[in-house]
Design a protein with these regions (language model features):
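Conserved beta-strand-loop-alpha-helix junction that forms the acyl-donor binding cleft
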Residues: 108-117, 135-139
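Active-site rim helix/loop that mediates acceptor-substrate recognition in acyltransferases
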Residues: 27-50
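A short beta-loop-alpha structural element at the N-terminal edge
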Residues: 2-16
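Helix-loop element at the rim of GNAT/NAT acetyltransferase active sites that forms part
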Residues: 17-31
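Conserved GNAT acetyl-CoA-binding A-motif
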Residues: 98-110
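Conserved acetyl-CoA-binding loop-helix of GNAT-fold acetyltransferases
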Residues: 83-96, 123
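Conserved beta-strand in the GNAT
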Residues: 50, 56-64, 71-76
Length: 142
């Protein structure tokens, strides 16, 4: 099983970007992998993890905590390593890191059309909640 450790920009960025492009695709500029990574590491919160085997990055997870709720983002597993328990290990690692900060509840979002990912999260204890997710892009003119 790969080891899970904190993301290290100098050694990990190229592989993480490639993994995310392979797993997520990306259709919008605000989700561009290099931008997302730069913004995350600028927070310096220690909640960005990678799963590494030898020198290969096989998975990622980012978490966030605002003092009230925790969030999971960018959970990605190399397609050749799916169904190996790696996704569950990444989520549990982030859950522990959030719990260590005092977090009592974790949220996440996914597309309602992504049935396989929804089934994965349900299998590890997450449930659909009666909420409406809303968002707004903030432009430089704000």
């Amino acid at each position: 099983m790969p080891i899970i450790r904190q993301y290290e920009d100098a050694t990990d960025r190229f592989q993480v970007v490639e993994l995310w492009r392979n797993v997520f695709g990306y259709e919008t500029a605000h989700n561009e992998p290099n931008l997302a990574i730069s913004k995350k590491i600028s927070t310096n919160d220690g909640l960005f993890f990678v799963a590494v085997e030898n020198t290969d990055i096989l998975g990622t997870i980012m978490a966030g905590y605002d003092g009230h709720r925790g969030w999971l983002y960018s959970v990605a597993v190399d397609p050749n390593k799916r169904l190996s328990g790696l996704g569950s290990s990444l989520v549990h690692h982030a859950e522990k890191a959030l719990a260590d900060l005092g977090c009592m509840k974790i949220n996440l979002q996914l597309l309602d059309t992504n049935k396989a990912t929804a089934a994965f999260y349900k299998s590890i204890g997450y449930s659909v909640e009666p909420r409406l997710s809303m968002g707004k892009l903030i432009t430089r003119s704000v």
